[in-house]
Amino acid sequence: MRNSLLALAVLVFSAGSLGAQTDGTYGGFSPYSVFGLGQMHQSGTSWNRGMGGVGIAARNHRFINILNPASMTARDSLSFMADMGLGGRISVFSEGDKRALNTTFNIDDVAISFPMWRHTAFMVGVTPVSDVGYNISYRDIDVYTQQRQFTSTGNGGTYQLFAAAAATFWNRLSIGAQFNYTFGNISKKSTIVNGDESYRTMVSGDSLQVNNLSGKFGIQYEQPISGQSVITVGATYKLSTPIIGHSVHYRELGSYDRKRTPSELKDKGLRMGDELGIGISFRRGDDFLVEFDYTRSDWSKSRMDQVSGFSNVGDVVFAPSVGQSFRLGGEFTPNRNDVRSGILHFFRRCTFRGGVYYDQSYYTVDGAHVNSVGATLGTTLPVFRWYNGLSVGLEFGSRGLSSSQVRERYFGFSVGFNIFDIWFQKHAYQ
């Protein structure tokens, strides 16, 4: 009980820390985060991200898999598991002859999982959903006010607190259900400074507090082939539900002409997009895994293009749409049971991962999606006893593949702490 309370305290503290970040430093940075809820954060732990983000059909009793709630029953029956991930990204933006560089760092996930009863398990955690971070400025010449400086800034993000339960039936079929609470603060601001001081500075913006309650369901089925080889198929579905919370739209013209308009988001008809995911994997014992995942998320009825603070301000046409992703990845362990000493034998116990992905954004800009393509590498170094490990992942990718879009080339890294212990064994005394 003491250990359980300690783990829960760490989780709650981490959730508070994530929420606090929305008012300060950037959790993510991209000019495309000006649209909607911002740039969607890649789901999953460092274990998932090292394999290109797959996990819908993955079952592994050594790692927590937060992509499919049905997967949590793949575990040792007496085990307590925890995962905490940190991540950062270096991005280079280019448009014509202009270049810019930015770095970000954020907590990626905190999750704990433990068994409840025979063939059942429970999981609770917190993870980012979207990031808003941008600072865009440019100048033009106006016939009346001479030179004008336009600046648009935004920061914040949304996070998801989740709790899930799952059960396995007939040793092959696993079903899970997850409750999601999404929360966060987003601030967007635009400023126009006129070169002629007789014209007042104009400021407008929105402060958003976003909340959402939703559910996610998952299923996995394992089919043994031969020996230790197993094919697993999996699917997930996340519900589309209303966005609640409140917003304040403000406009300022100089020091005296100020107007603030508060409103409730539940009255705007805003909705989160639903998401359907399917995956298939091939696993051979604990040594080899390869998986392909496809996800589709429909935001076309979210109404974000009709509500201030979510829609853009300017000539660019933003429209919510259907997002998709294709992911392929896997992992390999040379010899997990090699107990010999020496650096070579240590690396034979390590797990090595790789993956590729292609993402299509959940919106269009001037009629075109903002697509991403990337590759990932990862490894887990065994630490101490049981299945404790330190997972490290690298990511190389590019966003804005069309010649008319701002190109973002990024290098990301993630570090995950995988904690495993036996908490629920009963001791016999003579």
Write out the residue ranges for each language-model feature:
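Sec-dependent N-terminal signal peptides
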Residues: 4-14
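Hydrophobic alpha-helical membrane context
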Residues: 14-15, 80
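Sec/Tat signal peptide C-region and signal peptidase I cleavage site
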Residues: 16-20
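Subset of outer-membrane beta-barrel
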Residues: 21-430
